[in-house]
């Protein structure tokens, strides 16, 4: 998700 580095970054 967006802004979620722990879940994928972009």
UniProtKB/Swiss-Prot annotation:
Record-level GO cellular component terms: mitochondrial inner membrane
Pathways involved: Energy metabolism; oxidative phosphorylation
Family of this protein: Belongs to the cytochrome c oxidase subunit 6c family.
Keywords for the protein's UniProt record, in alphabetical order: Membrane, Mitochondrion, Mitochondrion inner membrane
Compartment annotation: Mitochondrion inner membrane
Complex formation: Component of the cytochrome c oxidase (complex IV, CIV), a multisubunit enzyme composed of 14 subunits. The complex is composed of a catalytic core of 3 subunits MT-CO1, MT-CO2 and MT-CO3, encoded in the mitochondrial DNA, and 11 supernumerary subunits COX4I, COX5A, COX5B, COX6A, COX6B, COX6C, COX7A, COX7B, COX7C, COX8 and NDUFA4, which are encoded in the nuclear genome.
Function according to Swiss-Prot or TrEMBL: Component of the cytochrome c oxidase, the last enzyme in the mitochondrial electron transport chain which drives oxidative phosphorylation. The respiratory chain contains 3 multisubunit complexes succinate dehydrogenase (complex II, CII), ubiquinol-cytochrome c oxidoreductase (cytochrome b-c1 complex, complex III, CIII) and cytochrome c oxidase (complex IV, CIV), that cooperate to transfer electrons derived from NADH and succinate to molecular oxygen, creating an electrochemical gradient over the inner membrane that drives transmembrane transport and the ATP synthase.
Protein name, per record: Cytochrome c oxidase subunit 6C
Biological process (GO), any one: oxidative phosphorylation
Recorded topology in the membrane: Single-pass membrane protein
Species of origin: Oncorhynchus mykiss
Mitochondrion recorded as keyword: yes
Main localization of the protein described in the UniProt heading: mitochondrion
């Amino acid at each position: 998700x967006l802004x979620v580095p722990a879940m994928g970054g972009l």
